[in-house]
Amino acid sequence: MFGLIGKKVGMTQVFQSNGIVVPVTVIEFEPNYVIGKKTMERDGYDALIMGSVDLKGSKVSRPIKGQYKKLENIEPKRYVIEFKGLKGYDAGDEVGLDAFREIKYVDITGTTKGKGFQGAMKRHNFSGGPSSHGSKFHRHLGGTGQATTPARTFKGTKMAGRMGGEQQTIQNLEIVFIDEEKRAILVKGAVPGVKGSFVIVKKAKKVGI
């Protein structure tokens, strides 16, 4: 499945020919290189290992340097992602935005903004307690335990805690515009993550559903 490693630049808006304003997210792509391949014969499935954004020399270990010695004029990469089912490229090839011309919808994966420690109402959208004067609690989450049996709170119970900073995928985002000169695409709607965070852009899996 076709995919690239990009960077979220931010949001803006564009006007369609009929005058409708569309909110879009700008995704910018540094050069994506194929740094490895997996084949059905050797690994049991076909895949390409893609890398993007050069890594500083001081942060590159010897084993990693050894892997890149086989690749000519390609520096070690900070972000390395495996895309299954993708063929037609060899190690060392640069993958451009050309394939996006044939794709209308994409799935984008990123890391959500970290919100820190938050209460149950903000974190899980709980209703809270009565807001009137006589109530003893207003933003409490309510009971979390059981009776004598099992006499414990189950793992995974929705409670207050650290919010955000999780991997999230938004599906079926429409590609509004492709700017090959600036190596960027505009997609309709919001994308998880802060400005400058890296995202994975793949061809949509569930188009038409």
UniProtKB/Swiss-Prot annotation:
SUPFAM superfamilies: Translation proteins. It comes from the Bacteria. The keyword rRNA-binding applies. The keyword RNA-binding applies. GO terms for cellular component: cytosolic large ribosomal subunit. One of its GO terms (molecular function) is rRNA binding. PANTHER family: 50S RIBOSOMAL PROTEIN L3 (PTHR11229), LARGE RIBOSOMAL SUBUNIT PROTEIN UL3C (PTHR11229:SF16). This is Large ribosomal subunit protein uL3. It comes from Borrelia duttonii (strain Ly). The lineage of its organism: Bacteria, Pseudomonadati, Spirochaetota, Spirochaetia, Spirochaetales. The gene is rplC.
